[in-house]
C-alpha cells in the first residue's frame, strides 16, 4: 500500500508496507484495512479512489531496490473525504460552481482553476507580517456563517420613532464619553458611524451604501472548549507553566457524521423554544466531508499571561476591578498583621488532612496549638475539637508542613477513650473521627507577633 505525502512544498511518494506479521495487535489489521481505500487518485485501473488522511506508526526500512519504505505497526484513520475530488484535466468545475464550492477547488491540484487563491494566501501572510507591529487589523474572514444563533432571533424594524429615541441617546454627553473609552468596554468601532447616520438608515427605502457594507460586521462562529474521549475516558488538555494553569487546549470535531448529529440536537432544542440554537449548516458539514485534518488549538487569556509574566499567584492581583467580597459579610476579624493561608498536614498513616491552627510567636518561645474540628460531629456534649502532638517541618517554598506522630496519637486516643463519660461519646470516637473524610478544611491564621503567654491569650480553645 502506498501513500503520497507533501514535503517542503513538493510531492513525494513514501511507500508504506502493511503486513499482518508487523502489527502489534493483529486483530486490528483486518479492521483498519476494511476502512482504507488503496491508492491515492487515479490508479492503474483508471478508477479514482477516495482521499483519506491516515496516521501511521512504524519503523523505517529500505526495500530491495533501496527505496525508502515504512513498515507500519499501527494505522489510524484520521479523516475521510466522502466526495470524489475533481480530476486535474477532466474534472474541473465551472468557474461559477467553483466560486460556491471552494472546498473542492482548493483541494484540487490543478493550477489553472483558481491561481489567484495561492497568490491571495501568500499576500495575506506577507501583509500580516508587515503589519504585525501596528494597529492594522484584517477585515477578511476565511469562514463566515451568516445565519448563526441569536442573529435570527426576533429582529425589530428600525422605525422612525425608534430612530429618534436612538438619536436622543446618542446626543447624551454621557454616551459620548463612554464611546470615547470604547476600548475599555469593547464597543464596535463602527457604532459612531451608524449612530451619526441614523436618520438616513431609518428611511423606509434605505439602501446600504458601500461604506455601510464595509463597516458592518457579521457575527461568526467561535471555538469553545471541546471535550474528546480516548478509550472511553474523558481528558482535558491544559497548558501549565510555573505550576499554574495557563490555557485550555481543544480539538476540532472533524467527523461530519457526528457534526450533523450535533446540529440535529440543536434543532430539537429549537423546537423546545431555544432561539439561540443553530440550524443545520449544510455548507459547514460539506466542508467536513472533504477530510478535515486533525486540528487543535489553545487560547491564552491576557490576565493569565500577565500573571505568568509578573509571577503573581492570584488573578485578582492583575485585574483592575476584581470581584471582592463586601466588608462585613461573612468576614472573620483577625488581629492586625494576620495573614491567612492553607497548610496541608501529612500524618504517618498516609491520610492527608487539612487542619486549622494558630501560631503564637514571641521573642523567646513559640507555642503551637493544632485545633482539629470534626465534621461528623453527631453527639451533643462531646468535645468539638482536640489538640495533637505535632512536630513542625518547613519546606523550601515557605509552606509549613506538620507531621503527626502515630505513637503519640495512639497514646492520646487511649487517654480520650478513658476520659469519655457516656456511651454516645465512646461510639463517636470509635467511628473513626480522625480520618480525612471526617475533618473539615479550615483556614490557617498566622499571628506574626503576640507577646502573650498561652495562659493569658484572649483566644479560647476547647480543653483537651
Curated annotation (Swiss-Prot):
It holds the Pfam family G-alpha. GO terms for biological process: G protein-coupled receptor signaling pathway; lysyl-tRNA aminoacylation. Residues 212-220 are annotated as: G2 motif. One of its GO terms (cellular component) is cytosol. GO terms for molecular function: ATP binding; G-protein beta/gamma-subunit complex binding; GTP binding; GTPase activity; lysine-tRNA ligase activity; metal ion binding; tRNA binding. The keyword Metal-binding applies. Residues 306-313 are annotated as: G4 motif. Mg(2+) binds at residues 48, 220. Gene3D superfamilies: Bira Bifunctional Protein, Domain 2 (3.30.930.10), GI Alpha 1, domain 2-like (1.10.400.10), Nucleic acid-binding proteins (2.40.50.140). Residues 36-49 are annotated as: G1 motif. Keywords: GTP-binding, Magnesium, Metal-binding, Nucleotide-binding, Transducer. Residues 33-415 form the G-alpha domain. Residues 382-387 are annotated as: G5 motif. Residues 235-244 are annotated as: G3 motif. GTP binds at residues 41-48, 147-151, 214-220, 239-243, 268-271, 310-313. G proteins are composed of 3 units; alpha, beta and gamma. The alpha chain contains the guanine nucleotide binding site. In the N-terminal section; belongs to the G-alpha family. In the C-terminal section; belongs to the class-II aminoacyl-tRNA synthetase family. Guanine nucleotide-binding proteins (G proteins) are involved as modulators or transducers in various transmembrane signaling systems. This is Putative guanine nucleotide-binding protein subunit alpha.
Amino acid at each position: 500500500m502506498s501513500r503520497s505525502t507533501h514535503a517542503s512544498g513538493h510531492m513525494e511518494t513514501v511507500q508504506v508496507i502493511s503486513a499482518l506479521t508487523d502489527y502489534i495487535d493483529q486483530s486490528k489489521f483486518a479492521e483498519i484495512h476494511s476502512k482504507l481505500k488503496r491508492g491515492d487518485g487515479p490508479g492503474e485501473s483508471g478508477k479514482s479512489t477516495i482521499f483519506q488522511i491516515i496516521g501511521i506508526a512504524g519503523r523505517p526500512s529500505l526495500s530491495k531496490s533501496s527505496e525508502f519504505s515504512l513498515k507500519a505497526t499501527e494505522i489510524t484513520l484520521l479523516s475521510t473525504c466522502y466526495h470524489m475530488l475533481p480530476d486535474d484535466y477532466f474534472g474541473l468545475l465551472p468557474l461559477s460552481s467553483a466560486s460556491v464550492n471552494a472546498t473542492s477547488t482548493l483541494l484540487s491540484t490543478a493550477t489553472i482553476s483558481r491561481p489567484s487563491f495561492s497568490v491571495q494566501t501568500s499576500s495575506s501572510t506577507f501583509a500580516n507580517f508587515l503589519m504585525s507591529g501596528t494597529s492594522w487589523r484584517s477585515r477578511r474572514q476565511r469562514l463566515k456563517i451568516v445565519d448563526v444563533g441569536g442573529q435570527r432571533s426576533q429582529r425589530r424594524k428600525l422605525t422612525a420613532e425608534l430612530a429618534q429615541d436612538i438619536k436622543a441617546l446618542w446626543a447624551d454627553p454621557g454616551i459620548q464619553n463612554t464611546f470615547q473609552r470604547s476600548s475599555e468596554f469593547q464597543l464596535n468601532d463602527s457604532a459612531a458611524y451608524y449612530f451619526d447616520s441614523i436618520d438616513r438608515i431609518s428611511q423606509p427605502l434605505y439602501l446600504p451604501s458601500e461604506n455601510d457594507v464595509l463597516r458592518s460586521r457579521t457575527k461568526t462562529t467561535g471555538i469553545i472548549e471541546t471535550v474528546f474521549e480516548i478509550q472511553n475516558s474523558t481528558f482535558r488538555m491544559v497548558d501549565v507553566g510555573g505550576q499554574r494553569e495557563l490555557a485550555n487546549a481543544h480539538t476540532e470535531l472533524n467527523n461530519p457524521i457526528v457534526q450533523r448529529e450535533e446540529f440535529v440536537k440543536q434543532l430539537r432544542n429549537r423546537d423546545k423554544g431555544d432561539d439561540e440554537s443553530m440550524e443545520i449548516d449544510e455548507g459547514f458539514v460539506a466542508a467536513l466531508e472533504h477530510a478535515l485534518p486533525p486540528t487543535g488549538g489553545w487560547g491564552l487569556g491576557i490576565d493569565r499571561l500577565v500573571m505568568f509574566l509578573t509571577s503573581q499567584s492570584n488573578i485578582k492581583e492583575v485585574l483592575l476591578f476584581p470581584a471582592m467580597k463586601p466588608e462585613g459579610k461573612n468576614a472573620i476579624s483577625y488581629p492586625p498583621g494576620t495573614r491567612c493561608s492553607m497548610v496541608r498536614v501529612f500524618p504517618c498513616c498516609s491520610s492527608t488532612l487539612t487542619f486549622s491552627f494558630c501560631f503564637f510567636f514571641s521573642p523567646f518561645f513559640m507555642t503551637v496549638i493544632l485545633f482539629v474540628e470534626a465534621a461528623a460531629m453527631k453527639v451533643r456534649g462531646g468535645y468539638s475539637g482536640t489538640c495533637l502532638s505535632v512536630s513542625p517541618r518547613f519546606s523550601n517554598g515557605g509552606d509549613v508542613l506538620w507531621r503527626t506522630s502515630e505513637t503519640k496519637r495512639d497514646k492520646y486516643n487511649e487517654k480520650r477513650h478513658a476520659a469519655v463519660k457516656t456511651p454516645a461519646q465512646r461510639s463517636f470516637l470509635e467511628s473513626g473521627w480522625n480520618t480525612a473524610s471526617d475533618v473539615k478544611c479550615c483556614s490557617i491564621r498566622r499571628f506574626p507577633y503576640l507577646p502573650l503567654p498561652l495562659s493569658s491569650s484572649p483566644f479560647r480553645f476547647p480543653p483537651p
